[in-house]
């Protein structure tokens, strides 16, 4: 600043306010670089050649910030007493301290400032997942969410810490959207055993598996359970399982049951057919019989075989041919054994009133007689003029006499004897009997009850 001799002249050139301040400063503290700096470790001070000897506040430099100063003297006096500096931080940084600094008379700035990197709130860790960040929670850091196996990310996969100290997008979550897995067995095919229409089929109950938390509901079955007897046909079996998020997993398979069949048989004309099981399945047996007055020719029973063919020959019902030329009454009766019931009407003369009335009533009830397999045998007269008649066939007198003697039928009075299909004497009558009373008695016979069932199935009835 020149020699001491010229200092008074120079002081006269300074502004009055600055001159006053200079006069108040002790000369011993006025030395180059004596100004105190409020800078922190990340702040840098500097000096300019033109005012390095000015003993005022140190120059300001804020890391990650910009400084705008206005000195009262203008020009290069930006650290002189009274200088005001505005501090602004760069994007992504925030100011810690006052945004306005003033150079004070103690050669110190009015505050200490620093620009620190902005920081967003710590992200919440999503359940069943997590996230990875490039630079923690600081400004411009990118964080990417991820989920554990079995879970799907819902929301923004990537978020960024913004200048407003908030994360971009909405926080993500991990939800269980993957259905549980369940595997069913393969198709079950079975063939029914002989004389059966169902098959017992078993399998292991499938277990579900969840890729998320492994917690599942009970397995729900739709269809018959394992170990059941399955009828013929295709059967759909379905298993369903849910996880805790109500995702549903299903699997299906079929149980196929086949029944070997030979094809349906038909009852012979004027006959009956009774079959076991379903009538035409492997192992089923069909039995045949004929209505009254007809004899069965062919196989009385046929079985459906494993080669799907029926055993035996086709049965037919032929009109019964009674042989009246046999020598004994026993041989005559044997022809009716298990085939026909006999109602033997005996009279000493054809003019007998009871005989004529009874014969008239029986003729009117012919349908009931046929329905109950009853053959009427007439014994008319007394030996040697005795006549035996079965329908249109006439038996010899000697055979007719044997029949009377075998069954102990009175020779000189009207009487009737009812013989069942096993040759047993079931009832005797010495007077007229109404056909309905006769039929009611026969309908109580055990064998007759079986016949009634078959006739009902064949819709065989008498309308009169």
Curated annotation (Swiss-Prot):
Gene3D superfamilies referenced in this protein's UniProt entry, alphabetically: Complement Module, domain 1 (2.10.70.10)
Signal sequence coordinates: 1-30
Cellular compartments annotated: Cell surface
Pfam families: DUF4174 (PF13778), HYR (PF02494), Sushi (PF00084)
Protein name: Sushi repeat-containing protein SRPX
Glycosylated position list: 34
Function per UniProt: May be involved in phagocytosis during disk shedding, cell adhesion to cells other than the pigment epithelium or signal transduction.
PROSITE patterns: HYR, SUSHI
GO cellular component, one term: cell surface
Tissue specificity comment: Detected in fibroblasts (at protein level). Retina and heart; less in placenta, pancreas, lung, liver, skeletal muscle, kidney and brain.
GO BP annotation list: autophagy; cell adhesion; negative regulation of cell proliferation involved in contact inhibition; phagolysosome assembly; positive regulation of extrinsic apoptotic signaling pathway in absence of ligand; response to endoplasmic reticulum stress
SMART domains, A to Z: CCP
Sushi domain mapped to chain residues: 57-117, 118-176, 260-319
Predominant place of localization: other
Keyword vocabulary terms for this entry: Cell adhesion, Disulfide bond, Glycoprotein, Proteoglycan, Repeat, Signal, Sushi
Disulphide-bridged cysteine pairs: 57-85, 69-103, 89-115, 120-161, 147-174, 262-304, 290-317
Species of origin: Homo sapiens (Human)
Domain HYR: residue ranges: 177-259
